[in-house]
């Protein structure tokens, strides 16, 4: 073992002496002092050395390692580091810009809608996405046999717990805690068993509620007209078309002039010149009864819209699924 140490020392020092550049020194350093180098291999042989020789051999091995480290240090001073020599930085090259994230288009639209309503004096309410059947259906005047309660349309967690199908439950929860006047919007995620180019199982919705004395359909039209003109432009035509919702009476769908063909008729609007964007109506008296409001003194209106629907119309997107595919080629356009 003593002879091996001496031979390794002689060979290593000779190799260091004959090295001609920093790269060769780096390679020799790895060969002799690396984790799998010759010195470490020699150290592993200490287990076979007789006990009475171990102190001497151990001292010689450590001296070898220290001597080689000193020799390599002097060689690096002479030639410099191979790594430093190879990694020359050209400071005249342009830098690589850092990738910076941005707001998702749905987030942008959602914030824009919320900003419009807060400037109109609305509060923002948040609530649970896993909701009781009572708040999601019963308190909103959905009969027990209403199609929306079917498994085809609703994700049931248990017999009386669902993933909310709209954010309307927050209207009921708000009225339970607050006496009129009420002016609130409820943005959030909702869930329905539906998936195609215009529907996803999870989507974003914003619903609103106004309750006070003397509230009329004219107030509803004024608020929603302001919303449409703020999101699109003040020349965008809109109409209120009679419809039905269990929690409003009368009810109306709100259509705007087709943003694709400007009302002349195209495939997107089924050649009608109009596109549906949201539902609305005067709050049904039975909804007020569930929260203990006196229907002889107050009235109110409610409305709801899908954020994806608004974004599709504003940006001219024909497939709702593009918003959720995380394709940067698409998202970077916004």
UniProtKB/Swiss-Prot annotation:
Cofactor(s), by name: Mg(2+)
Record-linked SUPFAM superfamilies: Class II aaRS and biotin synthetases (SSF55681), tRNA-binding arm (SSF46589)
Biological source species: Desulfatibacillum aliphaticivorans
Subcellular location field: Cytoplasm
Subunit structure as annotated in this protein's UniProt entry: Tetramer of two alpha and two beta subunits.
Protein family (similarity comment): Belongs to the class-II aminoacyl-tRNA synthetase family. Phe-tRNA synthetase alpha subunit type 1 subfamily.
InterPro entries hit by this protein: aa-tRNA-synth_II, aa-tRNA-synth_II/BPL/LPL, Phe-tRNA-synth_IIc_asu, Phe-tRNA_ligase_II_N, Phe_tRNA_ligase_alpha1_bac, Phenylalanyl-tRNA_Synthase, tRNA-bd_arm
EC number: 6.1.1.20
Cofactor, how bound (note): Binds 2 magnesium ions per tetramer.
Full protein name: Phenylalanine--tRNA ligase alpha subunit
Main subcellular location of this protein, as a coarse class: cytoplasm
Enzyme kind, highest EC tier: ligase
């Amino acid at each position: 073992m003593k002879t091996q140490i001496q031979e390794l020392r002689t060979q290593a020092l000779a190799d260091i002496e004959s090295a001609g550049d920093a790269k060769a020194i780096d390679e020799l350093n790895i060969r002799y002092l690396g984790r799998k180098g010759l010195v470490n291999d020699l150290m592993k042989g200490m287990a076979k050395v007789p006990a009475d020789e171990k102190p001497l051999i151990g001292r010689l091995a450590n001296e070898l390692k220290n001597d080689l480290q000193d020799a390599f240090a002097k060689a690096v001073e002479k030639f410099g580091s191979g790594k430093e020599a190879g990694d020359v930085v050209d400071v005249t090259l342009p830098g690589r810009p850092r990738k910076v994230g941005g707001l998702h288009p749905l987030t942008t639209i959602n914030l824009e809608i919320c900003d419009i309503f807060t400037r109109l004096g609305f509060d923002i309410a948040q609530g649970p996405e896993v909701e009781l059947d009572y708040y999601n259906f019963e308190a909103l005047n959905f009969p027990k046999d209403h199609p929306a309660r079917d498994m085809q349309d609703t994700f049931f967690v248990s017999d009386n717990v669902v993933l909310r199908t709209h954010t309307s439950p927050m209207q009921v929860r708000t009225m339970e805690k607050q006496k009129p006047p009420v002016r609130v919007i409820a943005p959030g995620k909702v869930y329905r068993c539906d998936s195609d180019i215009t529907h996803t199982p999870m989507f974003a919705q914003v619903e609103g509620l106004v309750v006070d004395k003397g509230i009329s359909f004219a107030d509803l039209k004024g608020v929603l007209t302001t919303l449409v003109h703020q999101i699109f432009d003040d020349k965008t035509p809109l109409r209120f078309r009679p419809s039905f919702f269990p929690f409003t009476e009368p009810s109306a769908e709100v259509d705007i002039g087709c943003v694709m063909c400007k009302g002349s008729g195209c495939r997107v609007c089924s050649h009608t010149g109009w596109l549906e964007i949201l539902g609305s109506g005067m709050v049904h008296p039975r909804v007020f009864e569930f929260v203990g409001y006196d229907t002889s003194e107050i009235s109110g209106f409610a409305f709801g819209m899908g954020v994806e629907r608004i974004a599709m119309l504003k940006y001219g997107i024909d497939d709702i699924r593009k918003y959720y595919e995380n394709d940067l080629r698409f998202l970077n356009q916004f």
